[in-house]
């Protein structure tokens, strides 16, 4: 009974963390003060998440490592690291939730590192969630055809998510190329959340297919069914996203500057005298 209760608590914490992550990535909707308090809430949930999963850390140096365990361990540790740095840098710029921690480190550096690590946390959180999906799908006991249809539909959705990821300029944050956050304050709040969900879905889909690929590598040859199918699905999702991006780019180029990321509908979050800094999302861990 206690085991079931612990599992339920873990699931609730996971769901709450995912919801808060989506809120943190919607800075233009929540505003600065609420963004900081949501970040504090996320920090508390992540600490609780580590406590609930403390046995995982106790077993990290025990047993053999198969491809799936290697992949999940790398993602989980990278996710925890990205969260710690995101939270630290966010608190170093805080003007509302924990203003007494302002200036713990250079604010200009903290701003760029916060953007950099928070977007990596978003990517890694998606992959972390996705790597647990095959287990949940297995419990649904779907027929092979049903599973294939579901995979194809999710592949299309993931492709749309990749398109939005590119359109919103996310890759620039991942490679430490963007010093300030470019946010569209004219976009409807519901659309911001929908885009965040779709972008997260892309990385969750990648995580799912990586997990399936790792598990396939552990099977005997006679047990494997379409072992390269996960690779095909990943490539298909990427191609769908790139094609939509190319088509969208061509259309917006003919649309007299409307749509996309134009200076007329995009605000650059700047900091004057480094007294106010951009805060974009605190997140996550295993």
Language-model region placement:
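Membrane-embedded alpha-helical bundles that constitute the cytochrome b-like, heme-associated redox core
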Residues: 1-286
């Amino acid at each position: 009974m206690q085991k079931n209760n612990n599992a339920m608590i873990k699931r609730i914490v996971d769901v709450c963390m995912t919801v808060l992550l989506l809120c943190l990535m919607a800075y233009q909707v929540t505003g600065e003060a609420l963004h900081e308090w949501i970040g504090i809430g996320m920090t508390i949930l992540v600490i609780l998440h580590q406590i609930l999963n403390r046995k995982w850390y106790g077993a990290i140096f025990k047993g053999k490592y198969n491809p799936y365990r290697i992949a999940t361990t790398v993602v989980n540790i990278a996710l925890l690291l990205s969260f710690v740095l995101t939270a630290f840098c966010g608190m170093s710029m805080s003007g509302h939730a924990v203003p007494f921690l302002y200036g713990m480190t250079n604010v200009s550096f903290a701003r760029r590192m916060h953007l950099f690590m928070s977007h990596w946390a978003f990517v890694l959180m998606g992959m972390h969630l996705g790597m647990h999906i095959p287990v949940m799908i297995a419990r649904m006991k779907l027929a092979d055809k049903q599973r294939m249809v579901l995979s194809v539909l999710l592949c299309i959705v993931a492709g749309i998510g990749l398109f939005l990821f590119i359109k919103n300029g996310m890759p620039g944050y991942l490679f430490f190329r963007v010093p300030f956050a470019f946010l569209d304050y004219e976009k409807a709040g519901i659309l911001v959340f929908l885009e965040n969900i779709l972008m997260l879905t892309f990385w969750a889909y990648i995580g799912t297919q990586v997990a399936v690929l790792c598990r396939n590598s552990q099977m005997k040859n006679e047990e494997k069914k379409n072992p390269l199918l996960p690779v095909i699905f990943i490539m298909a999702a990427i191609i769908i996203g790139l094609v939509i991006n190319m088509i969208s780019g061509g259309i917006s180029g003919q649309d007299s500057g409307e749509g996309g990321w134009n200076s007329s509908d995009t605000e650059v979050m700047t900091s004057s005298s480094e007294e106010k800094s951009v805060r974009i999302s605190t997140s996550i861990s295993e």
